[in-house]
Amino acid sequence: SQDTCRTWARELMSSTGNVSPDDAMQLATDLIHTGKLTTFQLNSLLEPIPRPLALGPYRIVDTLSDLLGLNWVQATDIHRGTSLWCIQWTRDDLQRPSYKAWPPSVDLAKHHSRIDGPALDRWESVLAEPGYLACFCESLHGQPLSQLLSQGPLSVESSIRMMRDTVSAIAGLHDQDLIHGAITPESIWKCSEDQFRMRRDPIIPPQSPYSASWNSVITTPEILRHATAAPEFTLPGTEPSRQSDLYALGVVWAHALLGRIPWPKSDRLDTNGWKKTHQQVPIELPASCPEPVARCIRYLVAKNPSSRFRDASQLAKAIASLDGAS
């Protein structure tokens, strides 16, 4: 607030020998050095059209673009002092063609904010004002599966643990008639030795992985989106479903065991090549993969949706039976 800024200015003027407040950059530098202002906040204020740094009860303190992608920032709850992640858009952002073609849904975000679970990320609130739209979620500690796999494949035991957590998360969404629609190694985080968490997109409605207007808040390389696209997406008008979520889980499981995308020539496939691959080519698995695990994965990635597990609950039971499979 302006009153807070005036108080800080008076404090700084006193502590620095009454430096003139007319020296705006000196004052800003001192505010950064004393922890009152972040470099990100200063840069935001200096933009031709400044982005808001206070949204409802939240203060925007830093960018998370390197970690999470465009429009992600770190926020602090002013009243509780807790740190949160925030995805935010200005009016200009939402005028981009991809958002106009596939706009955010505040109603969807409110639905997601009411759903919680130990293996799901927690979305706290959505703020929609004339000049901006923002969603706030808890901060996750750890690293995405994609980064973890850059160091090598998971063990069978770790992959089963990952699947238990992620299937629990997906079952919680499906039970509330919500489709994830963006399951890739970017949406699964290892938060501790014993826990994986599923990130979700609470505000952009799920869409085909091949969509030209793809703008999920979970920043995902095109190759990973296409690698997890169920065969039925080759049909025009196909929408994400429970079955396409299960297919994506199977691909991610195989990816985790191999340490790479489990389809041949994946780095050379165009969109048509990916569609033919999902329709015709068997998924790749390591030779050392135990047969009970391989059987689960093959059920998940069956070309015909009716040949897959019926739902996430049936998959959870199959995974529970894998104790000792490693």
What are these regions (language model features)?
Residues 1-112, 123, 129, 135-137, ...:
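Non-catalytic accessory regions
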Residues 116-124:
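Conserved HxN/HPN-centered segment at the entrance to the catalytic loop
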Residues 145-154:
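AlphaC helix of the protein kinase catalytic domain
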Residues 162-163:
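Activation segment signature within eukaryotic-like protein kinase domains
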Residues 168-178:
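Protein kinase catalytic-loop region centered on the HRD/HxD motif
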Residues 187-203:
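Conserved protein kinase catalytic/activation segment
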Residues 216-232:
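Conserved activation segment of eukaryotic-like protein kinases, specifically the C-terminal portion
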Residues 227-325:
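C-terminal lobe helix-coil module of Hanks-type protein kinase domains
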